[in-house]
Amino acid sequence: RTGEKVETQRLYDGRWAFVAENIPALSSEVYQIVSKKKSSRRFVSMIAENKILNNGIVRVEIDEGKGTISSFKRVGDSYEYASNSGLNDYLYTGRYASDPQGIEQILNIRVLDDGAVAATLRIESKAPGCNTLWRDVTVYKGIDRVDICNTLDKQDILDFENVRFVFPFNIQQPEIT
């Protein structure tokens, strides 16, 4: 594989991303990032309407009112994996789950990355118990996975409290094993 070129992308935070394909388990491969002229090839955007991520394998849609994942499907499959209330919802309660509260306001939904390798949407929200809540949702080219990174700028609250992120999947007759 020496000299084989792979797509690279500089992410919003300065890190580099690329997809390392066909690496057997418990093995390794060495990649080197070298500077070159900017590629003239255009990549296909994985973001639509600033609320939909689609890498050709999975499609994720963000609810603009709650910031949850309102739709989660495999491309070409009509089955909806997200329940009606949406995935990655924020739930804040007092001790013993008293006084449940959710997202107060979506401040903005913005594109962090949209390149040849990865696409990320950031949902910034006003949420109880937090100064700010950021929920980043990422898809990668050619990978059937969605990454979620939730970051809380937590308020200094001395009372008992619970913070949860809930993922109610649309599963008929779920069985816990």
Regions found by a protein language model. Name each.
Residues 1-157, 163:
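Catalytic and substrate-binding regions of extracellular carbohydrate-active enzymes
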Residues 164-177:
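Polysaccharide-binding surfaces and accessory modules of carbohydrate-active proteins
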